[in-house]
Amino acid sequence: MELLQGKTFVVMGVANQRSIAWGIARSLHNAGAKLIFTYAGERLERNVRELADTLEGQESLVLPCDVTNDEELTACFETIKQEVGTIHGVAHCIAFANRDDLKGEFVDTSRDGFLLAQNISAFSLTAVAREAKKVMTEGGNILTLTYLGGERVVKNYNVMGVAKASLEASVKYLANDLGQHGIRVNAISAGPIRTLSAKGVGDFNSILREIEERAPLRRTTTQEEVGDTAVFLFSDLARGVTGENIHVDSGYHILG
């Protein structure tokens, strides 16, 4: 069943085929959606274009969008308005922190490192939502990705955990602001997946092993599981869901 037939979504944050953003894109494509991709910097452009070309039947718009640059962000959504008109949602899959700030103790986080992580990983959702609102004239859903480290202390997550906590709070406030426009805002808290970002988290293999040994489902999370949950949140099946943080982590978050 093509739950998203005739709808258009922007997917932000694809880096390579292991990206959670790419898993979301594939699931949206399989559900009948039309996709627009953004990339940050020329280094990622080729990857994004090559991946977009693998989606059969899609002629995806691929646009530059550095979320730390207000002018480029505005220009991106203005181009979307000119080329497409209306969109029905955004998958915000963007986060970054300096690797050095993911080591050692959080108390030693640098001021610049803290602000960088907050700017890219948390504030960017608000900046994106402000621009997306202008082209989401039929309502829809804005989705972001978070992790358990935003709710509790996870070793080696440090400054990113604090940024994710900020992101999760932003989801609630944005949901309150944008609900009157028919726009829902939600987050998926995905379990650990081997992505480019995960390489920066120390002892990542140990985290995966613990999930496999202790999570109720006794397995790690897949791109497809996150992507299919995104389809639900973007579809009318979730029309009454906003301000939520849905865990897709084999149940690991319920453990004490």
From Swiss-Prot:
<dbReference type="GO" id="GO:0070401">
    <property type="term" value="F:NADP+ binding"/>
</dbReference>
<keyword id="KW-0547">Nucleotide-binding</keyword>
<keyword id="KW-0444">Lipid biosynthesis</keyword>
<feature type="site" description="Involved in acyl-ACP binding">
    <location>
        <position position="205"/>
    </location>
</feature>
<feature type="active site" description="Proton acceptor">
    <location>
        <position position="157"/>
    </location>
</feature>
<comment type="similarity">
    <text>Belongs to the short-chain dehydrogenases/reductases (SDR) family. FabI subfamily.</text>
</comment>
<dbReference type="GO" id="GO:0042802">
    <property type="term" value="F:identical protein binding"/>
</dbReference>
<feature type="binding site">
    <location>
        <begin position="19"/>
        <end position="20"/>
    </location>
    <ligand>
        <name>NAD(+)</name>
    </ligand>
</feature>
<dbReference type="GO" id="GO:0004318">
    <property type="term" value="F:enoyl-[acyl-carrier-protein] reductase (NADH) activity"/>
</dbReference>
<comment type="subunit">
    <text>Homotetramer.</text>
</comment>
<keyword id="KW-0443">Lipid metabolism</keyword>
<dbReference type="Pfam" id="PF13561">
    <property type="entry name" value="adh_short_C2"/>
</dbReference>
<keyword id="KW-0521">NADP</keyword>
<feature type="binding site">
    <location>
        <position position="94"/>
    </location>
    <ligand>
        <name>NAD(+)</name>
    </ligand>
</feature>
<dbReference type="GO" id="GO:0030497">
    <property type="term" value="P:fatty acid elongation"/>
</dbReference>
<dbReference type="GO" id="GO:1902494">
    <property type="term" value="C:catalytic complex"/>
</dbReference>
<keyword id="KW-0560">Oxidoreductase</keyword>
<keyword id="KW-0520">NAD</keyword>
<dbReference type="GO" id="GO:0141148">
    <property type="term" value="F:enoyl-[acyl-carrier-protein] reductase (NADPH) activity"/>
</dbReference>
<keyword id="KW-0276">Fatty acid metabolism</keyword>
<dbReference type="InterPro" id="IPR036291">
    <property type="entry name" value="NAD(P)-bd_dom_sf"/>
</dbReference>
<dbReference type="InterPro" id="IPR014358">
    <property type="entry name" value="Enoyl-ACP_Rdtase_NADH"/>
</dbReference>
<protein>
    <recommendedName>
        <fullName>Enoyl-[acyl-carrier-protein] reductase [NADH] FabI</fullName>
        <ecNumber>1.3.1.9</ecNumber>
    </recommendedName>
</protein>
<dbReference type="GO" id="GO:0036094">
    <property type="term" value="F:small molecule binding"/>
</dbReference>
<dbReference type="InterPro" id="IPR002347">
    <property type="entry name" value="SDR_fam"/>
</dbReference>
<comment type="function">
    <text>Catalyzes the reduction of a carbon-carbon double bond in an enoyl moiety that is covalently linked to an acyl carrier protein (ACP). Involved in the elongation cycle of fatty acid which are used in the lipid metabolism.</text>
</comment>
<feature type="binding site">
    <location>
        <position position="164"/>
    </location>
    <ligand>
        <name>NAD(+)</name>
    </ligand>
</feature>
<feature type="active site" description="Proton acceptor">
    <location>
        <position position="147"/>
    </location>
</feature>
<comment type="pathway">
    <text>Lipid metabolism; fatty acid biosynthesis.</text>
</comment>
<keyword id="KW-0275">Fatty acid biosynthesis</keyword>
<feature type="binding site">
    <location>
        <position position="13"/>
    </location>
    <ligand>
        <name>NAD(+)</name>
    </ligand>
</feature>
<feature type="binding site">
    <location>
        <begin position="66"/>
        <end position="67"/>
    </location>
    <ligand>
        <name>NAD(+)</name>
    </ligand>
</feature>
<feature type="binding site">
    <location>
        <position position="97"/>
    </location>
    <ligand>
        <name>substrate</name>
    </ligand>
</feature>
<feature type="binding site">
    <location>
        <begin position="193"/>
        <end position="197"/>
    </location>
    <ligand>
        <name>NAD(+)</name>
    </ligand>
</feature>
